[in-house]
């Protein structure tokens, strides 16, 4: 049984002798020793999958189909041959492998983690995975989020260059309250950034980026803040329960953490404007 501590949840992974390549970011979160907090057990098993893998709904080559089986959602992955793959059951947090199948090459542990629906284990505990650049500024976390291509990595790197910050994760962070205070946690997936540090920090602010000719910052009203957080939260859009949980978590975060809108250029002044706001010089916008 492999053990990883992610977002204050001890993930216990039983791979059922399925060969895994265990070199990657997930190993940064390995855990040894006792744990008295939340646990999630990922169980893998070998069982026939012909009824699902033979479906014409699944095209060829490393793609998946979404089904409902006995009122449980089911994701089926396969390799070329429709009778060669595995199924992920998000509701029960388990994975079914076709008996006797041989993975050539073996599964990459990081990729397997990314598709095993761990985000749901966070959502049911009032936590979430947020698509954002996670930056450590003096021992506190600031997250830059927004649409793809808006400049999350650019703003994070500007803070590194001009404010002595450090990027903890270039693409994702776990958000969860600890003793009533929201924190940002490291996460094993980091997109194409290549930056993945296992670090937990108190959360100071979430910054929603947009591009513009002038650098301006304001606190977003509650509705806009919740919409921005929800659009950046990882959940299956076809799963109503996950949407409901994600909405609840976004509402809780917006009620306790400043969610700021930063219209910005990719320059040092964008850092200065946001830094001044965060330090309290002009952060008295009505919410």
Report residues per predicted region.
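A noncatalytic interaction/capping subdomain that flanks phosphate/NTP-handling catalytic cores
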Residues: 1-148, 158-168, 173-287
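Hydrophobic positions on the alpha1 helix immediately C-terminal to the Walker A/P-loop
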Residues: 155
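Conserved lysine of the Walker
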Residues: 152
């Amino acid at each position: 049984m492999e053990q990883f501590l992610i977002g204050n949840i001890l993930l216990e992974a039983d791979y059922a002798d399925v060969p895994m390549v265990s070199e990657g970011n997930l190993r940064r979160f390995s855990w040894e020793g006792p744990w008295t907090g939340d646990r999630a057990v990922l169980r893998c098993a070998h069982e026939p999958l012909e009824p699902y893998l033979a479906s014409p709904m699944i095209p060829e080559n490393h793609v998946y189909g979404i089904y409902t089986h006995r009122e449980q959602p089911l994701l089926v992955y396969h390799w070329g041959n429709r009778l060669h793959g595995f199924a992920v059951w998000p509701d029960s947090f388990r994975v079914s492998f076709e008996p006797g199948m041989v993975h050539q090459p073996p599964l990459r542990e990081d990729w397997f983690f990314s598709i095993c629906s761990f985000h749901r284990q966070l959502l049911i505990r009032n936590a979430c995975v947020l698509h954002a650049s996670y930056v450590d500024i003096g021992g506190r976390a600031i997250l830059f989020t927004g649409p793809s291509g808006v400049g999350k990595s650019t703003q994070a790197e500007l803070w590194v260059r001009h404010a002595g910050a450090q990027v903890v994760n270039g693409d994702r962070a776990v958000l969860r309250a600890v003793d009533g205070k929201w924190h940002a946690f490291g996460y094993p997936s980091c997109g194409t950034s290549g930056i993945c540090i296992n670090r937990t920090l108190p959360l100071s602010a979430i910054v929603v980026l947009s591009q513009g000719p002038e650098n301006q910052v304001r606190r977003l009203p509650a509705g806009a803040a919740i919409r921005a957080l929800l659009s950046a939260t990882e959940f299956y859009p076809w799963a109503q329960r996950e949407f409901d949980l994600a909405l609840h978590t976004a509402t809780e975060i917006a009620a306790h953490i400043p969610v700021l809108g930063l219209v910005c250029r990719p320059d040092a002044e964008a850092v200065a404007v946001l830094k001044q706001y965060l330090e309290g010089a002009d952060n008295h916008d009505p919410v």
